[in-house]
């Protein structure tokens, strides 16, 4: 058997990684941790951290009850994730066990989401909308539908708004209340 020098081994491995397009693909700048299963990872991480901070018992049944409660407050893309998991009242399928069992033994959210992706690819297709910085955006240049979306995400509604100026004034009035809670609003 031949002995290989460490530099020859490193050179061989580096050449192999660069020549293999599948391995080199992960080295691209565009591939980031948020690129895949973004909603699933962030939602389950937040859920797991809330369980830890409240000192909840990590049994599958307890986690399932807490997940149902957590999903009852979810809105937007996170509500859609809860629907796919079966944690909403109108859900067609129920795969909560695929979340609660692994989480009861402290498996990271990334691994849980990868497993869920194999079961239902729609779960990882959910993406958060682009972020909107209310301090830098000109509300007058936005469409009324976009202004309504901002209010909807905040859980507010303007029944008396007839013109664009009414929506803009209401958003500016409510912004201090919600900018502290939601530093950047999704559009």
UniProtKB/Swiss-Prot annotation:
Subcellular location: Secreted
Recorded superkingdom: Eukaryota
Role played: Trophic factor for dopamine neurons. Prevents the 6-hydroxydopamine (6-OHDA)-induced degeneration of dopaminergic neurons. When administered after 6-OHDA-lesioning, restores the dopaminergic function and prevents the degeneration of dopaminergic neurons in substantia nigra.
UniProt tissue specificity: Expressed at high levels in the heart, skeletal muscle, testis and brain (at protein level). In the brain, detected in the cerebral cortex neurons through layers II to VI. In the hippocampus, detected in the CA1 to CA3 pyramidal regions and in the granule and polymorph layers of dentate gyrus. Weak expression in the striatum. In substantia nigra, detected in solitary cells that did not express tyrosine hydroxylase, a marker for dopaminergic neurons. Relatively high expression in the Purkinje cells of the cerebellum and in regions of the brain stem, including the locus coeruleus.
Protein name: Cerebral dopamine neurotrophic factor
An example molecular function term from Gene Ontology annotations: growth factor activity
Signal peptide annotation: 1-24
Disulfide bridge positions per record: 37-124, 40-113, 71-82
Pfam families from the UniProt entry: ARMET_C, ARMET_N
Family under the similarity heading: Belongs to the ARMET family.
Primary localization class, coarse: secreted
GO cellular component: extracellular region
Entry keyword set: Disulfide bond, Growth factor, Secreted, Signal
Organism: Mus musculus
PANTHER family per record: ARMET-LIKE PROTEIN, CEREBRAL DOPAMINE NEUROTROPHIC FACTOR
